[in-house]
């Protein structure tokens, strides 16, 4: 009975996501003609989103770096590897992410590991429904740019090494049709209570577009690994709750983040280039009213390999991680770490598909379910903060 009710909604979600891809394929792309969430400054090493080109820093960007004690040349030469707690920038306004040309080559991307946000217990009481049955993750159809264009991988560096998450291109209401916004999890950009902002954050839409195996990807051409290029983040916002308490059970319901990425030199916006972006649903419907939710991402922890996009579809249930904290969505899903930050989508009453959450946590020691935050006023404030900064 459960699967019979799920099927129509599941098919609708998959179909709706496919229909978000309207641009040319990556080889056909024509030439380009601040709340509950904390604000953050950032800067690029060049005027180009990937660092390509010879333009230098603007005075404004250079001043921002100087105020935060960042010497650009020393940073590019390896100073970014210094994770000393006393100098690790962590406050809302401290985010800096200078581009380092050529840093994220295919080999470095392959070596990136996934963070492992898990939880061993839930709060007792009426805020958690029975554990959902596992839903086996399905491989997304290839090429990804035709079937799930808004979905991609986020690469970054942490004290533990090269890391990877998932992310989704979302619409910018102040730049209709020209968004440069990417939605992900807070723990994919900031270490939370015990640390600061991660570094060298870049987004790769439709990573491994043809779904090649890890061994085949080792010999792939760059355009097969990142068909639309790389988009370095030049601004980031996460929730104040995550910055102050991230990594504790009290913070998981606030585990979301918004990135602004800068297009490559002379190119159109991220949305125009990829041809896809999803609206965000900030109505925070109760799990029982959210209906079928689809989660997309690139799971990396065993039994997955991190290079293949997967999806799960299930009806949302309730989960709480600590007393007096907001309820989270939970679905049955066998995706593992690496899918963190990947978008959760639902079909709205008007028939449109919208992002309603992102992958935050899973169970310690197994891979049967995922949980994500409800996106309400705090999440909307974070989204608005980035949108307003880049309006025009």
Name every feature range the model reports, one short phrase each.
Residues 139-149, 155-158, 170-173, 190, ...:
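Conserved catalytic-core segment of clan PA serine endopeptidases
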Residues 92-206, 214:
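N-terminal carbohydrate-binding/catalytic regions of secreted carbohydrate-active enzymes
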Residues 266, 365-392:
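C-terminal cap/linker of serine protease catalytic domains
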Residues 21-144, 392:
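N-terminal low-complexity, Pro/Thr-rich disordered segments
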Residues 145-147, 173-177, 194-197, 249-253, ...:
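Extracellular/periplasmic catalytic domains that process cell-envelope and extracellular macromolecules
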Residues 252-332:
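Chymotrypsin/trypsin-fold serine protease catalytic domain
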Residues 1-28:
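Secretory targeting and sorting signals
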Residues 334-358:
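Catalytic nucleophile loop of clan PA
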């Amino acid at each position: 009975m459960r699967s019979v009710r799920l099927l129509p909604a599941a098919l609708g979600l998959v179909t709706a996501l496919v229909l978000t891809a309207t641009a040319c394929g990556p080889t056909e792309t024509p030439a380009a003609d601040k709340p509950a969430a904390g604000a953050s400054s950032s800067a690029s090493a060049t005027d180009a989103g990937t660092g390509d080109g010879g333009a230098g820093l603007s005075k404004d960007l250079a001043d921002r770096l100087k105020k935060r004690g960042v010497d650009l040349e020393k940073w590019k030469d390896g100073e970014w590897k210094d994770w000393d707690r006393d100098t690790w920038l962590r406050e809302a306004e401290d985010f800096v992410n200078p581009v380092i040309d050529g840093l994220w080559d295919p080999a470095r991307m392959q070596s990136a590991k996934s963070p492992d946000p898990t939880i061993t217990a839930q709060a007792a009481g009426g805020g958690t429904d029975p554990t959902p049955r596992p839903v086996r993750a399905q491989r997304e159809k290839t090429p990804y740019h035709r079937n799930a264009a808004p979905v991609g991988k986020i690469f970054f560096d942490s004290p533990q090494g090269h890391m990877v998450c998932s992310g989704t291109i979302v619409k910018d209401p102040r730049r209709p049709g020209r968004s440069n916004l990417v939605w992900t999890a807070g723990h994919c950009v900031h270490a939370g209570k015990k640390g600061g902002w991660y570094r060298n954050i870049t987004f790769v839409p439709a990573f491994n577009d043809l779904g090649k195996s890890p061994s085949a990807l080792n010999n792939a051409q760059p355009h097969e690994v990142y068909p639309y290029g790389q988009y370095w983040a030049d601004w980031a916002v996460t929730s104040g709750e995550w910055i102050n308490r991230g990594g504790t059970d009290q913070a998981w319901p606030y585990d979301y983040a918004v990135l602004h990425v800068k297009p490559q030199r002379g190119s159109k916006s991220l949305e125009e280039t990829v041809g896809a972006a999803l609206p965000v649903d900030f109505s925070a419907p109760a799990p029982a009213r959210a209906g079928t939710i689809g989660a997309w991402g690139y799971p990396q922890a065993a039994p997955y390999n991190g290079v293949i996009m997967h999806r799960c579809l299930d009806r949302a249930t309730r989960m709480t991680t600590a007393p007096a904290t907001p309820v989270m969505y939970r679905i049955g899903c066998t995706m593992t770490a690496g899918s963190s930050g990947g978008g959760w989508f639902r079909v709205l009453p008007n028939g449109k598909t919208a992002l309603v959450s992102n992958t935050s946590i899973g169970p310690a020691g197994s891979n049967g379910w995922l949980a994500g935050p409800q996106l309400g006023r705090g999440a909307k404030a974070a989204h608005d903060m980035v949108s307003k900064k880049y309006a025009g």
